[in-house]
Every structure is written in structure tokens, then in C-alpha cells.
Regions:
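ATP-binding glycine-rich phosphate-binding loop
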Residues: 45-63
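Alpha-helical protein-protein interaction elements
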Residues: 15, 24-27, 51-55, 105
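ATP-binding pocket architecture of kinase catalytic cores
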Residues: 53, 63-172
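Juxta-kinase regulatory segment immediately upstream of eukaryotic protein kinase catalytic domains
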Residues: 2-45
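Residue-level detector of alpha-helix boundaries and kinks
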Residues: 17, 21, 47, 134-137, ...
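A short N-terminal beta->alpha junction/helix N-cap motif
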Residues: 20-23, 50, 78
Length: 173
């Protein structure tokens, strides 16, 4: 990962981005601002609400942005470091299998930006009552999780995906 700076986009024609988002590369920030501007009218986005949603162990970053129909998620995955094709392929397989995954609304493969539906900020663990493992609410959540796992198991994808073997695991680490 790289150092973070607070470079800003001086072009007033760009959307007013939330200054809480930091960019190490001013060119990447400008590309993001231009891409976001193109999505704003189409999806009713409010660029000033862009904020960090989460990050993972890769170069990908995730932002949450408010829109006319609620919040959406933006994935920033620089193409030089991240290939989003496997993500898109798996997302489409899971969605076709009726698994609760974010819907891909827009994908700019060349720039590595993606607009996704937002499943919310809460994880399964955060919704459980840890000191009451058999509580009714917990049971309902566990049942929902099991139903999702069953749907995943019913997806016939062996011929569409590379095997997740030791070599692939090592590349991802």
C-alpha cells in the first residue's frame, strides 16, 4: 500500500468530494472525481456524502455514498494492482443463485471503479447477542446464514471458476 496524502481536485467542474477521503495519487483522485460525476445524475448520487465504508487486505478501497434511493457502495480497485474480473464473475454467479450479494450497478473495468448496491454496515456478528447464544434473534440470524450457505452450495460453477487451490491462495496472500 502507499502513503496517503490529502491532494484535492482543483477543477470546480468536478463533484464536491468529501475531504475525509484521502488519495495518495492526485491523478487517481481526479479519475475518481470524473467517474463519479458521470454516475451522479444516472444514480442520483450526492458526491459530498462519499465516505469510507471499509477496506480489505488488498489495494481495493470501499466508499459509501448517499443517493436518491439510499446509500450505495463504490469500489476503488486500481487496475494495475487489482483484477476485478474474478470478483464480477463470482458476484454474477452468486446473484444468479439468489445469494444476498451486492448488485453491480456500474463497472468501469479500465479505471477500476465499480458502483454496487449497499447491503448495510452491519455484519452477522454485530447483530448477534453474544451473551445469549440461543436467543431467538440469534437463531433467526443463524438460520438466515445457513439458508445462504445452502443457496451457495446449489450453484453449479465448477466449470466456470478456477479451482481455489494452494497456488491461488498463495497469490492472494
Amino acid at each position: 500500500m502507499s502513503d496517503v496524502s490529502t491532494a484535492s481536485v482543483p477543477d470546480s467542474s468536478q463533484p464536491n468530494l468529501n475531504s475525509a477521503i484521502h488519495w495518495a495519487d492526485p491523478a487517481r483522485q481526479a479519475a475518481f472525481a470524473a467517474w463519479l460525476q458521470g454516475q451522479t445524475a444516472r444514480h442520483g448520487l450526492r458526491p459530498e456524502t462519499v465516505r469510507s465504508a471499509s477496506s480489505d487486505a488488498s489495494f481495493r478501497r470501499y466508499f459509501r455514498v448517499d443517493g436518491a434511493q439510499g446509500s450505495l457502495i463504490i469500489m476503488d480497485a486500481p487496475p494495475a494492482q487489482e483484477d476485478c474480473k474474478p470478483f464480477v464473475q463470482v458476484a454474477r454467479l452468486l446473484e444468479a443463485g439468489q445469494v444476498g450479494v451486492p448488485h453491480i450497478l456500474e463497472w468501469d473495468e479500465a479505471q477500476g471503479f465499480m458502483l454496487l448496491s449497499d447491503l448495510g454496515a452491519h455484519t452477522l456478528l454485530s447483530t448477534l447477542t453474544p451473551d445469549q447464544p440461543y436467543a431467538t434473534g440469534n437463531r433467526a440470524r443463524y438460520n438466515e446464514a445457513l439458508e445462504e450457505l445452502i443457496r451457495i452450495q446449489h450453484i453449479q460453477a465448477a466449470d466456470q471458476l478456477k479451482p481455489y487451490d494452494d497456488a491461488l491462495l498463495q497469490r492472494e496472500m
